[in-house]
């Protein structure tokens, strides 16, 4: 076969490869997920040594909760990661974290999340689909759910110090870290976190922050400030104390609960 014909066949193959990927994107845009998978599979059948189609198929399969096959696709993609653009490799690592979390494979989930964080931190790229604070927050969430509160606090702190420009996200992080500081008996730090959340948070959510700080004040025997915070919480939401009834009953001394009941006129029957 002559070189000219070989070049022609190569170009034709590449054109088909690109057209199948485009077809997949169009079908995905119309939420035809199975049609999109079929199209990208045709591209893979033409060239199964290129990582991007595997990543794209994994993303589609993730949308339809086909986690096992999505994970298999990423395993294939990672075989060719040396030829993978950083933005796609980052997407693949974060997707692998999400998939393995859904598969309850905690070890692989955290490994891939750390790879995404490391790539994000070492790359010279300026534009990323996910802010670094969000990655630290997800790692903190993961560690919190695993009961590793000290490590989770460390990750939330990195998120807060990462130059985050989203005030609502920053408030959320202080609130999360505040509760972990509470459970780790770091009450002064918890009070500071909740105070920041009160200052920066949306009005509709502030009753949560006031209640949390009030519980922290109870732990350092400052009932006067605790009562003041509970009062502020009620001004934000008249059902604030009722919302935290179980917390009062399980984590607050009975004499303090009785004081709150008397001071705020809570229905005693609901607390029995």
Predicted regions and their residues:
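Alpha-helical tetratricopeptide repeat
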Residues: 1-272
């Amino acid at each position: 076969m002559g070189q000219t014909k070989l070049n022609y066949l190569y170009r034709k193959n590449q054109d088909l490869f690109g057209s199948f990927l485009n077809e997949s994107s169009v079908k995905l845009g119309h939420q035809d997920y199975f049609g999109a998978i079929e199209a990208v599979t045709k591209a893979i059948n033409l060239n199964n040594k290129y990582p991007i189609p595997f990543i794209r198929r994994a993303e589609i399969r993730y949308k339809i909760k086909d986690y096992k096959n999505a994970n298999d696709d990423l395993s294939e993609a990672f075989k060719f990661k040396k030829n993978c653009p950083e933005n796609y490799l980052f997407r693949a690592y974060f997707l692998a974290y999400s998939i393995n979390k859904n598969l309850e494979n905690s070890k692989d989930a955290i490994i891939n999340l750390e790879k995404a964080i490391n790539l994000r931190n070492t790359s010279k790229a300026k534009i990323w689909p996910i802010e670094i604070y969000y990655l630290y927050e997800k790692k903190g969430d993961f560690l919190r759910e695993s009961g590793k509160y000290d490590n989770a606090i460390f990750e939330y702190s990195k998120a807060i110090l990462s130059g985050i420009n989203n005030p609502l996200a920053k408030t959320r992080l202080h609130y999360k870290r505040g509760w972990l500081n509470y459970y780790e008996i770091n009450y002064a730090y918890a009070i500071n976190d909740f105070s920041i959340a009160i200052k920066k948070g949306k009005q509709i959510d502030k009753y949560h922050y006031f209640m949390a700080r009030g519980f922290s004040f109870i732990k350092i025997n400052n009932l006067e400030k605790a009562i003041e915070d509970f009062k502020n919480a009620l001004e934000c939401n008249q059902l604030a104390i009722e919302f935290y009834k179980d917390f009062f009953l399980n984590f607050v001394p009975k004499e303090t609960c009785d004081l709150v009941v008397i001071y705020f006129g809570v229905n005693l029957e609901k607390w029995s």
